[in-house]
């Protein structure tokens, strides 16, 4: 659903839209080091590393399945052709994904020193961490040096109509954009104006770390 119109798209399309948002944010911020929290199979990280080979990328994933799949893919010599189709633009180095620092770990206890990354981001990951959301955000604020970028279904954009009924009925993610400053993350930009699911909206939020 976007701009008042219903659109028919696959999960493939949703991944590409969210990936394009990440690409544009990295182009804007020009970070030298990036961490994804809750990286799953590592698709976003893998494509970003190949597009921006000069950036040091790292990812943390809690599940055995996600971490194992990401590491198995990383052991290949080159990026598989079927993954290249996810990329919305050219890849500068199809082998750069082999340098990603993938780690299995908990977002509520990140295995990195304070201020280790210029940018920390999450994509539909905080929504799965409601019980540890506060600790995860505190850890994100601790390890980022400059910014946090989240594409998450914050309550702020799910407070009306079907979205409100959906999240309240499932007792889903309670976090709000307005909560971020309590962790030292001050929102600079927020938008839900991009194609996405009808019943659960995500919002792309950029926040700056301030002490």
Place the predicted regions along the sequence by residue.
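Conserved alpha-helix/loop element of class I SAM-dependent methyltransferases that forms part
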Residues: 13-30
């Amino acid at each position: 659903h976007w701009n008042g119109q219903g659109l028919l798209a696959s999960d493939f399309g949703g991944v590409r839209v969210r990936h394009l948002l990440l690409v544009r944010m990295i182009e804007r911020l020009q970070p030298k080091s990036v961490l994804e929290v809750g990286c799953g199979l590592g698709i976003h990280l893998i494509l970003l590393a190949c597009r921006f080979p000069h950036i040091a990328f790292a990812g943390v994933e809690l599940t055995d399945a996600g971490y194992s799949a990401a590491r198995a893919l990383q052991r290949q010599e080159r990026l598989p052709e079927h993954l290249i189709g996810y990329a919305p633009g050219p890849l500068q180095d199809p082998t750069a994904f082999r340098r990603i620092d993938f780690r299995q770990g908990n977002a509520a206890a990140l295995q990195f020193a304070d201020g280790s990354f210029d940018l920390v981001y999450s994509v539909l990951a905080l929504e799965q961490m409601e019980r540890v959301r506060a600790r995860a955000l505190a850890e994100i604020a601790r390890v980022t040096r400059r910014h946090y970028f989240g594409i998450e279904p914050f309550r702020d954009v799910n407070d009306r109509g079907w979205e409100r009924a959906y999240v309240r009925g499932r007792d889903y993610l309670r976090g709000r954009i307005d909560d971020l400053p309590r962790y030292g993350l001050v929102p600079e930009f927020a938008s839900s104006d991009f194609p996405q699911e009808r019943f659960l909206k995500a919002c792309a939020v950029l926040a700056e770390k301030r002490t």
